[in-house]
Amino acid sequence: MEHQVIFFQGTDISPAAHLAFAQAFGEIDEPHPIYPSVDGFDRIVKLENNSDVPPDTNSWHTDLTYKRVQPFASILVARSIPELGGDTLWSSLYAAYDRLPKGMKSDLAGLEAIHDLGDFRNTFSDSSTNTPSEDRLNDALPRFGHQVRPLVDHHPVTGRPFLNFNEAFVTHISGLTTNESNSLRVWLANHMNRPEVQIRWRWQAGDIAMWDNRVTMHYAVADYYPAYRCMNRVTVVHDRRVPN
């Protein structure tokens, strides 16, 4: 658990091998409620953008924290990459916590954040059938609703504390007024958006990134439109090292 994201460069991994690799680490997540799947592999999410399907998640986020069980890891394979742009950044939630002022660590202890899929409607554009549509999102909302998670949590394997904040899905901090909650959310987002706690990856076709989804946020930079970009992602729900 020394590294929160690792990379494999220039592979020719097939969808079947991608899925098998992910299964070695734990249970695979169900098909994504909004994004399409790779043909013949419903557990592999197809993230495809071009001039007709612009990028739709141009924000920092941790995957699927609105679900009851927050996924353990994501494994992303680059299938087609634009000549310019399309990088992905990761932010360490360990480092974000470590860099908090001592008083802020004390203030955040015991606070809880509401992670809600409904806020996702503000981060996507509905321009084609391949982009998340309003109908598909609305269909997913009753199934997932929201989850309440501590703002400061501890990794189940390492025990290290981390800042459990997800800019894309956290809609409110429990126990605070709306103004207090909004101010704290902005402060936390700015605190985590620092180069000192980030890594940036310039993709080549065949590259693989695997990251610990519990202690990172990531940002797919949407600077390549209208060029074509295609990525495949498998999400691992449960870490085999952690008892159910």
Predicted features and spans:
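Non-heme Fe(II) oxygenase catalytic core, chiefly the N-lobe of the double-stranded beta-helix
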Residues: 1-208, 213-244
